[in-house]
Amino acid sequence: MIIDAHMHLPSGEPDLDSKKRRLLSDMRANGVDIGIVISDSELESTIGSMDDCTELFSDCPNVFAAAGISPYINYRKQLEKLKKYLTLGFFVGIKLYCGHEPIYIDDGDLKPVFRLAAEFDVPVLFHSGWDNAQCAAPERAKAAAAANPEARLVCCHCYYPKLAKCFETLKSCPNVYFDLSSVADDPEKCPSVAQVLERYIPEMPERFIFGSDYGCCDQRRHIDFIKKLDIPSDYLQDVIHGNAARIYNISS
Ligand SMILES: [Zn+2]
């Protein structure tokens, strides 16, 4: 069983329906049983908006969606819409594109997002690492985790490429989880990334989640990378499906 907890609609297809078909066929080809597709925070996007992603995957029992949102884009209205969708059980997470947009993860403007996440028991995902890395630097993520103890925070990309700094700073925050998407993107960095993961996964095996960033990164390469890690097989099972199922409340 593999859950890829970090996917986007792929580029290179003419419309949303063909993107969906490609994504589903790639999941099958790569042996991925369950996927979480993350929408953009934009109202129109090549990776799909909140509306697009709910509509597209409502008939796919093995594909769940997480909703992108931004304090800069129609915030109040999008929050209302998000609440409506969460009430209907349409999203399993909420994503903040810290760094891609000038959003600081510990900014007070994000309070309504954390409140919704707590109310509907879904995690808040945030981009971290390359691309204005200061927006979700580990110290800021730590502050956000402490300010929102009732929320689960998912740190996407683990502050890539500074993974060790991320784990060291955030290991004391029990409500922060680590999404491994895109960490195997650069084959040259894979050996050093593997070394860091082989050290930290056994320290907190319940807090790592497999993801590939499908749509931006190679899913097959990420699966091969994670399966080759030198960690106990129980921990590998946690990382490739058990933890995601629990953290996102999805059955596997
Ligand atoms: Zn992504």
Each language-model region and where it sits:
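Active-site gating/metal-coordination segments in enzymes
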Residues: I34, G48-L125, W130-D131, P174-V176, ...
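Active-site neighborhood of phospho(di)ester-bond hydrolases with catalytic His/Asp-centered motifs
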Residues: I2-A5, I36-S39, A66-G68, K95, ...
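Alpha-helical scaffolding within the catalytic cores
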Residues: S18-L23, I47-E55, Q78-K81, P138-R140, ...
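Divalent metal-dependent hydrolysis catalytic cores, especially in the metallo-beta-lactamase
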Residues: H8, R22-E44, N62-S70, V92-G93, ...
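Mid-to-C-terminal alpha-helical segments outside catalytic/metal-binding sites
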Residues: M1-A5, D17-I34, A118, M204-R207, ...
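Histidine-centered catalytic micro-motifs
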Residues: I2-P10, L125-G129
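Catalytic pocket-lining loop regions of alpha/beta-barrel enzymes
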Residues: V92-G93, D107-I209
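Active-site environment of divalent metal-dependent phosphoester hydrolases
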Residues: P10-E13, E42-S45, Y72-N74, E101, ...
